[in-house]
């Protein structure tokens, strides 16, 4: 039963703003306590989200990623609603949001648990930080004219040193995002496997790889010039030579609410790729 719902909208999208207002009024009229806001507001006041039963994310995949960041620490499920964008995370559009909410209010739908990855940044034996991603962790060049040298180890076994524009470690969910654009394989999102994808690699015969779910991937920067660490397209942390980023599956998951059968993924995938 839904008692409290958070509605996340994109402040740069008129369609998202309009639908968020209308949906909030619709939910309140049905006796559901509803909090409407943008990601910054919910980050600054996490108590607004912590006791919610559901977050509805209105926008593209960027909005869904922001919703995931807000919700997974509290185990709150997310209902993604795509607004005119090519989306691999959302299965319904604005025309279905009200019937979808009614379906959820009546006990329908199912929970789709997606794998997260955790990345730890180490420098000279000291852990500098820890970050969690739904899509991917990326080491990339910070200078457009230079490539980076990234030494990759999997489960303590050296793999190779990529001379590339960057290296991606993605989840199955992220396999249809940056990793796909870089030439990586598409992995069924129900899988817990990880994907290793070099970005425009030079002089290497090691292609993209699908790794087992408990793989531990260590990426060490071996370039004298700086590089950047990005987590789901955010953070952009400066890296220096010798820095290590250790990526493994997180014990936490991101939960989406789905209204269609799980076997619809491939049908939706083909439709989305045809539109891209």
UniProtKB/Swiss-Prot annotation:
BP GO terms, sorted: NAD metabolic process; NADP biosynthetic process
Domain of life of the source: Bacteria
Could you tell me the EC number(s) of this protein? 2.7.1.23
Q: What class of enzyme is it?
A: transferase
Where is this protein found? Answer: Cytoplasm
Q: Which is a Pfam family this sequence falls into?
A: NAD_kinase_C
Per UniProt, NAD(+) binds at 61-62, 66, 135-136, 146, 163, 165, 200
Gene3D superfamilies noted in UniProt: Probable inorganic polyphosphate/atp-NAD kinase, domain 1, Probable inorganic polyphosphate/atp-NAD kinase, domain 2
Keyword match ATP-binding: yes
InterPro entries this protein is in? ATP-NAD_kinase_N, ATP-NAD_kinase_PpnK-typ_C, NAD/diacylglycerol_kinase_sf, NADK
Needed cofactors, names only, are: a divalent metal cation
**Keywords, alphabetical:** ATP-binding, Cytoplasm, Kinase, NAD, NADP, Nucleotide-binding, Transferase
Give one GO molecular function term.
NAD+ kinase activity
Main role? Involved in the regulation of the intracellular balance of NAD and NADP, and is a key enzyme in the biosynthesis of NADP. Catalyzes specifically the phosphorylation on 2'-hydroxyl of the adenosine moiety of NAD to yield NADP.
HAMAP family, per the entry: NAD_kinase
What protein family is recorded?
Belongs to the NAD kinase family.
Question: Under what name is this protein listed?
Answer: NAD kinase
Q: Supply the gene name.
A: nadK
């Amino acid at each position: 039963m839904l008692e409290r719902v958070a509605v996340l909208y994109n402040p740069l999208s008129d369609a998202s703003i309009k639908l968020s207002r209308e949906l909030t009024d619709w939910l309140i009229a049905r006796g559901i306590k509803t909090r409407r806001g943008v990601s910054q507001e919910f980050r600054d006041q996490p108590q607004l989200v912590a006791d919610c039963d559901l977050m509805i994310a209105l926008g593209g995949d960027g909005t869904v990623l922001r919703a995931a960041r807000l919700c997974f620490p509290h185990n709150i499920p997310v209902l993604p609603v795509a607004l005119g964008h090519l989306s691999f995370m959302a299965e319904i559009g604005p025309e279905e949001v009200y019937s979808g909410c009614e379906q959820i209010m009546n006990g329908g739908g199912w929970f789709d648990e997606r794998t997260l990855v955790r990345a730890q940044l180490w420098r000279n034996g000291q852990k500098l930080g820890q970050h969690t991603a739904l899509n991917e962790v990326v080491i990339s060049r910070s200078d457009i004219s230079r490539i980076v040298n990234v030494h990759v180890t999997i489960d303590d076994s050296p793999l190779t040193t990529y001379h590339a524009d960057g290296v991606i470690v993605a989840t199955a969910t992220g396999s249809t995002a940056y990793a796909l654009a870089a030439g990586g394989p598409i992995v069924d999102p129900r899988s817990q496997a990880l994907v290793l994808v070099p970005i425009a690699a030079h002089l290497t015969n090691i292609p993209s790889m699908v790794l087992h779910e408990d793989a531990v991937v260590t990426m060490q920067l071996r370039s004298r010039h700086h590089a950047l660490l990005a987590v789901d397209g955010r953070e952009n942390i400066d890296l220096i030579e010798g820095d290590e980023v250790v990526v493994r599956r997180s014990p936490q998951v991101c939960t989406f609410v789905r209204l269609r059968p799980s076997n619809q993924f491939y049908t939706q995938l083909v439709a989305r790729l045809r539109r891209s």
